[in-house]
From Swiss-Prot:
One of its GO terms (cellular component) is spindle pole body. Its main location: cytoplasm. Residues 64-75 have a biased composition (Low complexity). Belongs to the BBP1 family. This is Spindle pole component BBP1. It comes from Saccharomyces cerevisiae (strain RM11-1a).
Length: 419
């Protein structure tokens, strides 16, 4: 038999091979058999003697190891045998078997098959919808982990539940507990009777029937009271809804009024803002004009100060000029007087010079006449008579009124001097 036949397993052949190996021994050692195996999960198909190994469960987030038991006659079987004969696979504490990984059996199905059927159902909301309050009274409250797999989450009643507190009040429960028998599931209205009845219930049927009728009447009265209270609550709820509707309408009316008032106030505020903007612009322009006028005023004041200084300086210069003019006038008058004196003196000198010239000319003419007389004859002075009146008066002084000159005579003198 080749290596492929040795490694292949499952079905009748695997059982036969296991029997042969158990009786006559195996040709392949366990260490060589599992060498170069790709899938470690196939180790469970072969006998390991007393060797236990750890297996990893991928479905659990916290990977834990578990010890497998000694291999038995069912170790070499594959999942087809379980499906063929409707057998359950090996089930460990985690609710998952690595041999049947990928099988159509799920954890829920395995759990439901292995768990016993409850007499009082633990999930009445899913299994028995006709149960109203029986499971709440006789069933132990389940934890969150037990309810995690339910399609409809079970919500236990609170202590302040009005229906349960009204129907199952503390006094009524204590009275039932003090009764000769305990309240069963069948006594609760709306719950189908259980097919399994107890022995003592059969013996005391008539007594319990009478008590049950009495209790049913009490429960009916409680139900009617609850229905009346529910009717009152419905009326109160309608009134409350009407009040809420009226309050909503009033709220909408107030909101519209507030909205309209807001729009009006907003429009008024916008107009006031526009007016404020215009007023601010005018104020700003007036401020600019005021600054310009103040600047002009400051310049005017400075110019006036400069003008006053210039005027004062001009007044001082005017006084100085007037003083200089007076000085110049005085000097001019002095110069005029001096000029007049000099002119008089000059005239006097000129008169003196003229008289001297006249005397010299007279002497010269006399000398010339004497020479002519000596050379040409006598009576020299018979032809020429000189008048000295233009130059000298009787007092031998200058005549300022006679300024006429004999130009021809002077020319003759000049010609005589040049010769």
């Amino acid at each position: 038999m080749n290596q492929e036949d040795n490694t292949g397993g499952g079905g009748i052949f695997g059982l036969f091979k296991w029997t042969k190996d158990a009786l006559f021994g195996t040709d392949i050692s366990p260490s060589m058999k599992y060498k170069d195996q790709e899938e470690r999960r196939d180790r469970s198909r072969y006998a390991q003697d007393d060797t236990n190994f750890s297996m990893k469960f991928g479905n659990d987030s916290n990977r834990r190891s578990t010890n497998l038991s000694r291999s038995n006659s069912w170790s070499g079987l594959d999942s087809t045998l379980h499906r063929k004969y409707e057998l359950l696979p090996e089930y460990n504490e985690n609710g998952f078997n690595s041999i049947v990984n990928g099988d159509h059996h799920s954890k829920e199905r395995i759990r439901s098959l292995r768990s016993p059927a409850p007499i009082v159902p633990r999930e009445p909301l899913r299994n028995e919808p006709t149960d109203t309050f029986g499971h709440r009274l006789h069933t132990k409250r389940r934890t969150i982990n037990e309810l995690s797999n339910s399609q409809i989450p079970f919500i236990p009643p609170q202590e302040d539940d009005p229906l349960l507190s009204k129907l199952f009040n503390k006094d009524g429960v204590n009275e039932v507990r003090r009764s000769p028998y305990k309240l069963s599931v069948k006594d609760i209205p709306g719950k189908f009777p259980s097919p399994l009845t107890k022995r003592d219930e059969i013996d005391n049927y008539y007594v319990r029937d009478e008590d049950a009728c009495h209790k049913n009447r009490e429960y009916k009265k409680a139900y009617f009271d609850l229905f009346a209270q529910m009717d009152l609550n419905s009326r109160d709820l309608e009134d409350l809804c009407e009040d809420v509707r009226e309050q909503r309408e009033q709220f909408h009316r107030n909101e519209q009024t507030y909205k309209q008032a807001y729009e009006e106030m907003r429009a008024e505020l916008v107009n006031e803002l526009k007016k404020s903007k215009t007023l601010f612009e005018n104020y700003y322009s007036l401020g600019q004009k005021y600054k310009s006028l103040k600047k002009v005023l400051d310049q005017t004041i400075s110019h006036e100060a400069e003008l006053a200084t210039s005027r004062e300086r001009l007044y001082q210069e005017e006084d100085l000029k007037n003083f200089e003019i007076q000085t110049l006038k005085q000097r001019l008058s002095d110069l005029e007087l001096k000029y007049t004196n000099l002119q008089i003196e000059k005239d006097m000198q000129r008169d003196n010079y003229e008289s001297e010239i006249h005397d010299l000319l007279l002497q010269l003419s006399l000398r010339n006449n004497e020479r002519k007389d000596t050379s040409a004859g006598s009576n020299i002075f018979s032809t020429g008579q000189y008048d000295r009146t233009p130059f000298h008066n009787g007092n031998n002084s200058y005549d300022s009124n006679s300024h006429s000159w004999d130009t021809d005579y002077l020319k003759n003198i000049d010609g005589f001097i040049e010769r």
